């Protein structure tokens, strides 16, 4: 699972995920990518599950880039606990995603194989996505 090595604070406020992505909105490394078209939070487990689904489909060929990183801590209180008495303990990491953000990229395999691999990855994610191809490919 992906997680940061060191963070300034153990617990963050949730905040709001407004607007559209301006950074990371184009396919930069690969030939074809998976782009989010709605707001959401992707946990490190979801990011890893999608990566494994892609890698199993493309087997040994090609290269995959993960363009997002889970750097926000997620907290949770124990089950059957009353409200109050502070914020819960950190249980994992998530990456906030805005519409337009490219999540994954693939290069080195045929476009048909890459599209099928990205479709399988999209089924593992909680946000709506669309497959985008870099111009000139």
Curated annotation (Swiss-Prot):
Keywords: Ribonucleoprotein, Ribosomal protein, RNA-binding, rRNA-binding, tRNA-binding. InterPro entries: Ribosomal_uL16, Ribosomal_uL16_bact-type, Ribosomal_uL16_CS, Ribosomal_uL16_dom, Ribosomal_uL16_sf. GO terms for biological process: translation. It comes from the Bacteria. Signal peptide: none annotated. Transmembrane segments: none annotated. GO terms for cellular component: cytosolic large ribosomal subunit. GO terms for molecular function: rRNA binding; structural constituent of ribosome; tRNA binding. Belongs to the universal ribosomal protein uL16 family. Binds 23S rRNA and is also seen to make contacts with the A and possibly P site tRNAs. HAMAP family: Ribosomal_uL16. Part of the 50S ribosomal subunit. This is Large ribosomal subunit protein uL16. It comes from Nitratidesulfovibrio vulgaris (strain ATCC 29579 / DSM 644 / CCUG 34227 / NCIMB 8303 / VKM B-1760 / Hildenborough) (Desulfovibrio vulgaris). The gene is rplP.
